[in-house]
Amino acid sequence: SLSCCYSASRQLAGGCLFSIRIFAEETPTMLQIGKTLVSLDVIESKFVCDLDKCKGECCVAGDSGAPLEESETIEIAAAYPLVKDMLQPEGIESVETYGTHTIDSDGDLVTPLIGGNRECAYTIFENGIATCALEKAYFQGKISFRKPVSCHLYPIRIQKLKNFDAVNYDRWDVCSAACKLGEQLKVPVYKFLKDALIRKYGPEWYNELSLAAEMYLKSKED
């Protein structure tokens, strides 16, 4: 059973009370912030994408498309006509065959893959680096949807539990260069993914995560 190492709570603007708890048995393993359980790997591990080294392999490797929230399937369907001319011919063929989204073997909503087992259908290549056509169109002002939040959050993965979201750091060997660069620059995962985490959970939640991280790291020094 988990025991509470220490706890703190703060009253935020609008009357929302966020509780922060650090759980531990012999050593801490997670932070509870509101309805999320955040792995301490997200606080302690370092990460900065190094596209010159990895070439965007996370858009290519893997046996399933990018996980999607139901609302995102609507956004992508609306965006597709505006990004179609940016896609690889094989990407267009995949979308025309499988749809703008599909369901994988686990029953989850995902983006379609080229050939059913290659890169995401929305992947494009620029100077040998795999990037996202949706994100490129977003920055060009063509669409208002940036990219699936699961992609934006990577290397964080969200697991839906009964009463909580589990916020975990997903270690993948294709990201080894990002781990090295993160260590060199001393940037933890949660700071590298600040924008994505705010997109997912909001600025107040992120501020509480930052506070909890500072509290936890200070407790390790004491």
Predicted segments with their positions:
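Cysteine-centered motifs
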Residues: 4-5, 16
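A residue-level detector for conformationally permissive "hinge/kink" positions
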Residues: 6-8, 48
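Intrinsically disordered, low-complexity, compositionally biased regions/tails
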Residues: 8, 18-20, 103, 111
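Short, Lys/Arg-enriched N-terminal segments with co-localized hydrophobic residues
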Residues: 10-11, 15-29
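Short loop/turn segments that flank or connect secondary-structure elements
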Residues: 29-222
